[in-house]
UniProtKB/Swiss-Prot annotation:
<dbReference type="GO" id="GO:0003911">
    <property type="term" value="F:DNA ligase (NAD+) activity"/>
</dbReference>
<keyword id="KW-0479">Metal-binding</keyword>
<dbReference type="InterPro" id="IPR001357">
    <property type="entry name" value="BRCT_dom"/>
</dbReference>
<dbReference type="GO" id="GO:0005829">
    <property type="term" value="C:cytosol"/>
</dbReference>
<dbReference type="InterPro" id="IPR010994">
    <property type="entry name" value="RuvA_2-like"/>
</dbReference>
<feature type="binding site">
    <location>
        <position position="456"/>
    </location>
    <ligand>
        <name>Zn(2+)</name>
    </ligand>
</feature>
<keyword id="KW-0862">Zinc</keyword>
<keyword id="KW-0235">DNA replication</keyword>
<dbReference type="InterPro" id="IPR012340">
    <property type="entry name" value="NA-bd_OB-fold"/>
</dbReference>
<feature type="active site" description="N6-AMP-lysine intermediate">
    <location>
        <position position="142"/>
    </location>
</feature>
<feature type="binding site">
    <location>
        <position position="461"/>
    </location>
    <ligand>
        <name>Zn(2+)</name>
    </ligand>
</feature>
<feature type="binding site">
    <location>
        <begin position="60"/>
        <end position="64"/>
    </location>
    <ligand>
        <name>NAD(+)</name>
    </ligand>
</feature>
<dbReference type="InterPro" id="IPR004149">
    <property type="entry name" value="Znf_DNAligase_C4"/>
</dbReference>
<dbReference type="InterPro" id="IPR003583">
    <property type="entry name" value="Hlx-hairpin-Hlx_DNA-bd_motif"/>
</dbReference>
<dbReference type="GO" id="GO:0006260">
    <property type="term" value="P:DNA replication"/>
</dbReference>
<keyword id="KW-0436">Ligase</keyword>
<feature type="domain" description="BRCT">
    <location>
        <begin position="619"/>
        <end position="709"/>
    </location>
</feature>
Amino acid sequence: MFTPEREKELQEKTRELLRKIKDVKVLSFEEAKKLAEDLREVIRYHDYKYYVEANPVIPDYDYDRLFRALKEIEKKYPELITPDSPTQRVASEISGEFPTVKHYTPMLSLDNAYSEDELREFDRRVRQITGLEVVEYAVEPKLDGAGIALVYENDLFVRGATRGDGEYGEDITNNLKTIKTIPLKAEFSRFGIKLAEIRGEVVIRKDEFQKLNKERMEEGLPPFANPRNAAAGSIRQKDPKEVAKRNLEAIVYHLSYVEPPETEPPTHYESLKMLHTLGFKTLFKDTKVCKGIDEVIEYCKEWEKKRDSYPYEIDGMVVKVNDRRLWKVLGYTSHHPRWAIAYKFKPRRAVTKLVDVVFQVGRTGTITPVGKLEPVELGGVTVSSVSLFNEDFIREKDIRIGDWVVVERAGDVIPYVVEVLKEKRTGEEKPVEFPKYCPSCGSELVKLPEEVAIRCINISCPAQSVLRIKHWASRDAMDIRGLGDATIKLLFNRGLAKDVGDLYYLKLTDILKLPGFGEKSAMNLLKAIEESKNRPLDRVLYGLGIRYVGQTTAKKIAEIINSVWDLKDIPLEKLMRLEGIGYKVARSIKEFFNIPQNLEVLKKLEKAGVNLAKKVKEKVADVLKGKTFVFTGTLDCCSREKAGEIVEMLGGKFSNSVTSKTDYLVVGKDPGATKLSKAKKYGVKTITEEEFVNMIKDYVDLEKIKKEDKKEKPKIGRLF
C-alpha cells in the first residue's frame, strides 16, 4: 500500500507533527485546518502499520498524542470534522487475506484517559447523563494483545474473527481453534442463552514471548518488537499448524451480544463471572467493582505499581460502568462507547546516547548487534544496553554510533530503540559496521539467502560452545542445579568442559580448583550432574540444542524413536510426517547428525551413562512416597483436586488442611491467608506451583491432565 519512499516521508512527517502539537488550542482556523489534514494522513498510515501489518513504527504513546491533537482541533472547530476522519470511525485491520464476517454489535475502540483529572471528567459526564450521585464501575487490566470476537451457537464455537474495521472482521476461526484457552463447547444453554458473541484478546505470556523471540533470532528471523505484535502476527498465519506452535492464549473480557435478549446478565461483573464459570480464561479474578471514582483511581494506581509482575503485557486499566442497563442510556460515539474508558499507564521511555555497538555470538552462531548506552533509568531499572536485533533493523532505522535515541521498556521485554532523534545529530555520528569475521573464533561469517541474520558456522566456536553447555544444563533440558553461567565459563576456559560430554567426567578435585567452591558445594554440583543422567529422552533431544528443535518438537520426535542414535539413520520423509515438522526442521536434524564432532559428543555421553534411549520409568508410586501435600490458591496446571490425585498416584498424601505433619504447602495464585499462617506456625515448607511441577513433570503428562481437567463439568452456582 505504501512505497518505501512514501513510508519514509510519512515517518518524517510524524516526527515533525509530534514536535508541533504541544498546544493546538491556540491555533487559528487556517493553522488548525492544515494541521488536521496532516494529522489525518499520518494517523491513517500508522493505523495501517499497526492493525494490518501488525508492525507499528511508533510507540502507542506517540500515536495517542497525534490522535488526541486531532480530537482537540475537531472539538474547537467542529466544521473541520470529516466523515472519514480517524476520530469518527474504528481503524481498519482488514488485510484482504481472509473472508470477512459482520460482527453482531460494532467492535469499537476505547477512549483514553492519561490522568486522574481525565478519569474524574469521565465520571462527571457519566453521572450527569445517568443522574446518579455515585456510579459503580468494574475495573480490570487492559491487555495489550490482538482483539477477537467469538461466536457460540447452541453451545458450540462456530466463528472467530478479528476486530477488522469494527463492523466487519476477518474470519480466522480455524486459527483460533488451535488456541487451547478457547473452549470448542461452552454450555451457555444452562443460562438460557442460544447465541452469544464474546470479545477478547489473543495474548502471549511475557516469558513465552522472550522464548519465541530467542528462537526466531537463532533461526535468523526478525524478532517481534513486542508481545502484541507477536499475537497479532500469529493469528493471521495462513497455516493453523503454525499458529498452534506459538503458545498463544485467548482471554475474554466482554459479553457483547446474546439471544434471546432477556438472558443478558444485569452487570458486567456478573457476565465475567458467568464466562469464567463456563471455562473461559477471563479477567474475573483481577476485576474489582468500585463504588465511585476515588476507588477506581486507587485501584488503577495499585495496578500501575505491580504491572511488571503480571504474566501478560498490560498498558493500562479499563474502567466500565458496571450496570449494563446504563450502557443504553449512555450510548456510543462512532469511535467508542461512552460507558467505558481506558486509563493508560505512563510510558517507560527515555532519551539517551548510543555510545557503541558490540556483537554477540548466539548458541547457534547468530551474530546479534548490541547497543551500548549511556546508563538511563527506565521504570525503576537502569538500562545500559539494548538489542539492535540485526542488520536490517539498524539500516531501517538508520541507527548510528553517537546518535541520541528514544528507548522504551515494556514489562519484562528487553528494552529496544523506538526512534532515532536525527535532529540532534552533529555530523560526528558513525555508521554501524558489521563484522566479516566471528568476534569469538575469527571464522568468516556467512549470510544464508533465507535469513536476515549473519552467522558463524564453526562448530568449535568458543562462544557457541559455552552457550551450548548452558542450554544443556538449563531447567527445561537436563536441569543441572548449581551449574551457572560463571561456572560454565570457568570450566570451559580451563579446558575442563569443552562440550556437554565433558561435564560427566569432572572430578571433585577439578571443581575444588574453581573459585567459590568448597567441598560441600562441589559435591552438590557433582550430584546434580549425576542425577541429570536419567532425564527423559525428549529433554535430552532438546538439550542437544539442535537448531529449530524446541521442547514441543523434541517431545514429538521422542514418541517415534527409541534412541537418539535412531535420528542418525531415520529417513527425512519420516520426520516430516510428524505434525509441525517441515523440511527445514527435518533437514536441520539430519545436518546435526552429519557433523562428526556432534557424534563424538554423543559417544562421550553414552559412555558416561547418560540416558540416550527411552526411559524405563521407575515405579512412579515411590516418587512422592511419605510426603504430605496441601494446596492453596488457584493452580495453572490443573485443579487442586486433580493435583491431589497426582500426589496420591505418585505415592504421596493429599490433605486439605495444614498440620504439623504436612511436608509441603504448594502456593498458587491468590492463596488463603489461613493456610499460609499455619504453614509458618508449624514450619511447613512452602513451594511455588512451578517447584511442584518440577517434582512431577517427568512422571505425568501434564498437558493431557490439563485437557482432561478442563473437560470435567464445572460446578455452577447461582450467578444472577
